[in-house]
Amino acid sequence: MAQPITGVTASITPKIRPVRRASLKRGFLCVFIARRWRRSHVDLGILLVTGPTGSGKTTTLYTALSRLNTAERKIITVEDPVEYQLEGINQIQVKPAIGLDFAGALRSIVRQDPDVIMIGEIRDLETCRIAIQSSLTGHLVLSTLHTNSAAASITRLLDMGVESYLIASTVSGILAQRLVRRLDPATRVAFEAPPELIAEHGLDRLTEQRPILLYRGGYHGRSAITELLVMNDELRGLLMRHADAATLEQAARRAGLRTLHEEGLRQALAGVTSLEEVLRVTRGEGA
């Protein structure tokens, strides 16, 4: 009779990523690229997408690439792994076992004179320096970082050892995002927001609707909440003076940035998601 295993145990969580062709011409990410990133009017520089694992960063990058993909542009990606096959785009999967890491792949592709470079993730200083050098020599560079907010990405780059003047001269925009569960319109129910919730979250400053309504119900699908930091002269000046993330965020808000928390509250008021869901994914980030 087999004896139960005791003591040391193992746990395996497989993550199956079938390589497939991307179908990214619809949905909130496509609208975001069209309305928001293009608003920054940048052709060169570094655009970063930041957020925790599972927040949709890679999908956002793929959507951006599908928007940028034209016959006139040469686009090369370095990824780990290649999650979607994008027609007309050269995609490289890193293989550390044979010595092909992000930095090595990037050193190779910059010699191929691409117009756009997508780096799956900036993981170390060497990769970051090559990305910066690429942007300084006329390439648009897209990549991701793991930080809690757009402003925190700047301090993360500083902590990695990147000089402040290089960040100021190369980073064009940073998008932070989270995914929230979307309320199912078939089961969604509106209710009047209690006064304590209105006061706690400042809901009366975000909508002119009276009474103020929130929504609850079952969930179906997901939606993104985002904050977009576009580099401007004030931010560059603060960066050169080594301002912290909070100071950078305050300056970005004066220029029109909506924090993840505020954007989430607006979606809750619009019935896209519930207040509870917004608080779940943004707690501690401007809440």
Model-derived segments and spans:
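Short, flexible helix-loop junctions that flank or precede catalytic/ligand sites
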Residues: M1, I12, A22, V31-A287
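Intrinsically disordered, low-complexity segments enriched in small polar residues
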Residues: T6-G7, S11, S23, G27
